[in-house]
Amino acid sequence: MSSIKKIEKARELINKNHKIFKCPVCGGSMYLKRENSLACGSGHSFDLSKKGYLNLLTSGRAPVYSKDLFESRRKVCEAGFYDPLIEALTEIIAKYSGSSPKTGIAVLDAGCGEGSHLTGISQRMNELHPGRAEQNTVAGKNVFTGIDISKDSIQIAARGEPDIIWCVSDLSSLPFRDGSFDVVLNILSPANYGEFKRILSRRGMLVKVVPGERYLAEIREAVGGGEKAGGSKTESYSNERVVQYFEERMEVVDILDIGYQFHVEEQLLPHLIRMTPLTWGKDADGLLSSRGMSEITVDLTVLTGQNK
């Protein structure tokens, strides 16, 4: 899709859904101006990129992850590494959607990275509900929005999926009005429960994905931490505190464990290594290639909670 078509599509989606936004500076209502910018009544204005995304970041905070990490994660996702997770999340959202009196729901992926997870979910939701394939409209259609603090990651996300609203934003102060979303996804990303609860509808759902004890165990072992082949551990990981924190703040509906082995083709291995912070500052390329690694463990916990 050309840059002109991307910005036109993004403009259409944002214009139809401008009421979900609040000004990240003053909190005022926002509207889309003719010159492709989202503005409030006080004159604060945020440009819509010709690449099809909004930059609503007001602070100078530098993103933690590099563009290379997100490019690699996109390739890993395209290879099907997270497909069982995407299927499970789609099922959770579809179940919620089916019980909702609305004909369409609003979904936010908070900390969406390069957008692979949300893109996969939106595509599968359209397959389940063909009548809702025209997304991001006010009148009864599904609305999918992805945000991340990394401009690089959002640029990558906007390359692939024109029917999702993509925004650069900070989780510490989300640029959305109270009660704007029915479902908030938080996938392998830091959380801000106060903001999530604020932007969720009265009985909205927070779906948080956290790593399990054996997530990427082979990589953790290779770089000096995690479970060894014989079962002993050098440095174990537990998500117990994260789960407890979730349970204290949300009305827990379900806890789902997802575990499987993924066969890694040789050409995918460098991208798998680069997509995780576990390998920062490590000679992981050499370590993994020397061990002839071909199977990687995926161990995830999906926490589903309702807004209290």
What are these regions (language model features)?
Residues 17-18, 258-308:
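Conserved Class I S-adenosyl-L-methionine
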Residues 114-132, 136-138:
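Conserved SAM-binding loop of SAM-dependent methyltransferases across substrates and taxa
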Residues 204-214:
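Conserved beta-strand signature within the Rossmann-like core of class I S-adenosyl-L-methionine
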Residues 162-174:
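Conserved SAM-binding strand-loop segment of SAM-dependent methyltransferases
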Residues 2-63:
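N-terminal auxiliary segments of SAM/dcSAM-dependent transferases
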Residues 11, 63-88, 92, 96:
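Class I SAM-dependent methyltransferase Rossmann-like catalytic core
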Residues 102-113:
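Conserved class I S-adenosyl-L-methionine
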Residues 172-183:
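A short acidic, Gly/Pro-enriched loop at the edge of an enzyme's catalytic core
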